[in-house]
């Protein structure tokens, strides 16, 4: 009777390992593109482009942090291929975005496209939240997934739309008044707003993880006990 239970635990661990490995690899690739393109603007003559490098770093930190949080709260057997395909698509978006450091017009256009890719990822992941709610009957799991579901909806209905609109507004502003933003260098205010928004979001993710930490441990223990009883 214990063999199937042991197999489920082993498969859960295997899927978690795959997820963490994929996250590390694709964000490592994104970091390579960021550093490779950052070296072309890191001079005093291009100091106005430095915030774009910081914004890129914040994007990587946010994606990695959210991915790890997602893995620790939701990932179990079976492996979710579409979810991982979304991750790869997001990494491609990051790589393309980082090639446009030093080009504010293209940066904000691609930032808008990137937000449009990440936005439906949160909607898709609601399926995984519902799946975990069904196979996790404990009290800790119920509280954990109530918080996770609330966070998913907050991202779908508020945080991602706000980020999308911020980037879209910045892109349209540059297209409407290129001399004001590009020639006169006022694009630094737009990238400054993006950096602040990304920094605030990263702080939110870190604090949210702190709230979930004890519930993640308790839920994993409940999963283990459920597996042992089967």
Task: List each language-model region with its residue ranges.
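Alpha-helical transmembrane segments
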Residues: 44-57, 102-121, 190-198
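N-terminal topogenic module of multi-pass integral membrane proteins
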Residues: 1-70
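C-terminal transmembrane-bundle signature of multipass membrane proteins
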Residues: 160-230
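Hydrophobic alpha-helical transmembrane segments and adjacent interfacial helices
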Residues: 25-41, 85-104, 164-178
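Membrane-proximal helix-loop-helix units in multi-pass membrane proteins
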Residues: 88-156
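Membrane-water interface of transmembrane alpha-helices
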Residues: 59-69, 116-138, 204-215
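Loop-to-transmembrane boundary segments
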Residues: 10-23, 144-167
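Cytoplasmic-side transmembrane-helix entry/capping segments in multi-pass membrane proteins
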Residues: 75-86
């Amino acid at each position: 009777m214990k063999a199937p239970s042991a197999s489920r635990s082993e498969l859960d661990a295997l899927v978690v390992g795959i997820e963490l490995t994929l996250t590390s690899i694709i964000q490592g690739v994104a970091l390579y593109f960021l550093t490779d393109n950052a070296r072309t603007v890191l001079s005093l003559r291009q100091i106005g482009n430095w915030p774009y490098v910081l914004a890129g770093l914040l994007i990587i930190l946010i994606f990695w942090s959210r991915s790890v949080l997602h893995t620790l709260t939701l990932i179990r057997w079976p492996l979710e291929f579409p979810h991982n395909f979304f991750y790869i698509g997001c990494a491609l978006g990051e790589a393309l975005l980082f090639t446009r450091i030093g080009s504010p017009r293209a940066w904000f256009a691609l930032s808008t496209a990137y937000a449009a890719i990440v936005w439906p990822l949160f909607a898709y992941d609601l399926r995984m939240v519902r799946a975990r709610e069904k196979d996790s009957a404990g009290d800790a799991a119920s509280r954990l997934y109530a918080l996770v579901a609330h966070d998913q909806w907050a991202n779908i209905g508020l945080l991602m739309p706000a980020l999308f609109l911020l980037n879209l507004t910045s892109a349209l502003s540059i297209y409407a008044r290129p001399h004001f933003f590009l020639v006169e260098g006022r694009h630094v205010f737009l990238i400054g707003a993006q950096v602040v928004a990304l920094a605030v979001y990263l702080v939110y993710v870190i604090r949210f993880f702190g709230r979930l930490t004890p519930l993640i441990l308790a839920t994993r223990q409940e999963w283990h006990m459920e597996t042992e009883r089967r």
